[in-house]
């Protein structure tokens, strides 16, 4: 049976989490869905997988709530269920930055559609002639799997390090059009709002993140694959599972070449473990 995988998020003020949480868990469990839903005062972030009918039924139920009516999930297909259980969690933030909470009612940062971004990158500047800086907001191990050509990345181990990294390099972004990007949009949206708040004038978020860019325009101006947080580890620009795998022991990304090492034992170890590099994803 083919499994539909969806991911979606929205920054929206929620003050009824204690009611939403059991209702969502009951709905998902009744439909046989598995995955994780995060609820916080600043919004919702979800990753679900299951049969098409069950996914469509849940989304119809979710859309009946006016706060979530415009959520458009990103989809992919798999032969296997990537999640082991169904979790609905209440959190302080739907993506951890450890900064003052996003205020959804204040609005989101401007976004740039994948097709428009491709045009900017093709021509070497935005529509007003300013240079474009592609700013990768992801963790270092994700960037190592693939990123945009000439992208700026701050070698951060977790997203909560992003504000300090931006503060240290803020002057380098002056006078340029900054496009923040991430896997599916949630981190680059929060990052873009933060950059606006600290005085960076021309900031955009890549609408839908790297995966939406792959879906709409392919891999133009992108090098490598895109790390994803499930059993597939990485997707290529055709949104197909790629070669890199994640080590279950240390969570490092293992390239196809590294998988040939005698130190790579599925589920047990990899060259990173043996070499002492044990950085957990956060």
Swiss-Prot record:
Residues 128-222 form the Rhodanese domain. The keyword tRNA processing applies. Its EC number is 1.14.-.-. InterPro entries: Rhodanese-like_dom, Rhodanese-like_dom_sf, TrhO, TRHO_N. Keywords: Oxidoreductase, tRNA processing. GO terms for molecular function: oxidoreductase activity, acting on paired donors, with incorporation or reduction of molecular oxygen. It catalyses: uridine(34) in tRNA + AH2 + O2 = 5-hydroxyuridine(34) in tRNA + A + H2O. GO terms for biological process: tRNA modification. It holds the Pfam family UPF0176_N. The active site is at residue 182. It comes from the Bacteria. The keyword ATP-binding does not apply. SMART domains: RHOD (SM00450). Belongs to the TrhO family. Catalyzes oxygen-dependent 5-hydroxyuridine (ho5U) modification at position 34 in tRNAs. This is tRNA uridine(34) hydroxylase. It comes from Cupriavidus taiwanensis (strain DSM 17343 / BCRC 17206 / CCUG 44338 / CIP 107171 / LMG 19424 / R1).
